[in-house]
């Protein structure tokens, strides 16, 4: 094994160039992801459907493209949200929207009741979601004490397109961590052993 690596160790300039090419590929992928995040106004502009709660609209493993530049979300629109305190994207349909009425009791962060809404807090829309394949709405999935989603705080983006089954690769990699190590090791070896 080490004897097969000796030609690469003999020419450090070529080895350095190959490592630099690998770093260039990684940094380009990172820059494309960040550029797409800025363009869509979403921290995660592409997500994979992880469960069957949205069948038949989306299957497990479908790759979704998100857009988060619309100020409002309509009933019937499919959104991706994160539960407060957890970083698990959930893909469900908006079933109902709630207007933010001034003078009503509001639940603020920390669960404090009885604080009136200020005019600046009226800008964020409140949403209730449900999976197409679920029997009830998502109030059980929300954080403790949360009865609805806040458009600005909880929504990652609205679904604007999808590619079926492409995301199944990421599901396999997350369900089998050893597969991720094997794949990364194989890719690293291919870059190092590649001849120009």
Swiss-Prot record:
Residues 101-133 are annotated as: Disordered. The chain crosses the membrane at residues 15-33. Disulfide bonds: none annotated. The keyword Protease applies. GO terms for cellular component: signal peptidase complex. Residues 182-193 are annotated as: C-terminal short (CTS) helix. The keyword Hydrolase applies. Its EC number is 3.4.21.89. Glycans are attached at residue 134. CDD domains: S26_SPase_I. One of its GO terms (biological process) is protein targeting to ER. One of its GO terms (molecular function) is serine-type endopeptidase activity. Residues 34-196 are lumenal. Keywords: Endoplasmic reticulum, Glycoprotein, Hydrolase, Membrane, Protease, Signal-anchor, Transmembrane, Transmembrane helix. Catalytic component of the signal peptidase complex (SPC) which catalyzes the cleavage of N-terminal signal sequences from nascent proteins as they are translocated into the lumen of the endoplasmic reticulum. Specifically cleaves N-terminal signal peptides that contain a hydrophobic alpha-helix (h-region) shorter than 18-20 amino acids. Belongs to the peptidase S26B family. NCBIfam families: sigpep_I_arch. PANTHER family: SIGNAL PEPTIDASE COMPLEX CATALYTIC SUBUNIT SEC11. The C-terminal short (CTS) helix is essential for catalytic activity. It may be accommodated as a transmembrane helix in the thinned membrane environment of the complex, similarly to the signal peptide in the complex substrates. Component of the signal peptidase complex (SPC) composed of a catalytic subunit SEC11 and three accessory subunits SPC1, SPC2 and SPC3. The complex induces a local thinning of the ER membrane which is used to measure the length of the signal peptide (SP) h-region of protein substrates. This ensures the selectivity of the complex towards h-regions shorter than 18-20 amino acids. SPC associates with the translocon complex. This is Signal peptidase complex catalytic subunit SEC11. It comes from Ajellomyces dermatitidis (strain ER-3 / ATCC MYA-2586). The gene is SEC11.
């Amino acid at each position: 094994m080490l004897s097969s690596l000796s030609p690469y160790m003999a020419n450090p300039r070529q080895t350095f160039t190959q490592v630099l090419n690998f770093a260039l590929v990684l940094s380009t992928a990172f820059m494309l992801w960040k550029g797409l995040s800025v363009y869509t106004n979403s921290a995660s502009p592409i997500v994979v459907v992880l469960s069957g709660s949205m069948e038949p609209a989306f299957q497990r493993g479908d790759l979704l493209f998100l857009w988060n530049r619309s100020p409002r979300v309509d009933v019937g629109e499919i959104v991706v949200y994160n539960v407060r305190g957890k970083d698990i994207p959930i893909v469900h349909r908006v079933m109902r929207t709630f207007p933010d009425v001034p003078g009503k009791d509001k639940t603020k962060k920390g669960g404090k009741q009885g604080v009136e809404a200020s005019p600046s807090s009226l800008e964020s829309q409140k949403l209730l979601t449900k999976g197409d394949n679920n029997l009830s709405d998502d109030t059980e999935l929300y954080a403790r004490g949360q009865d609805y989603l806040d458009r600005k705080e909880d929504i990652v983006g609205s679904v604007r397109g999808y590619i079926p089954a492409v995301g199944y690769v990421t599901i396999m990699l997350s369900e089998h961590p050893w597969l991720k190590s094997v794949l990364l090791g194989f890719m690293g070896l291919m870059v190092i052993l590649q001849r120009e």
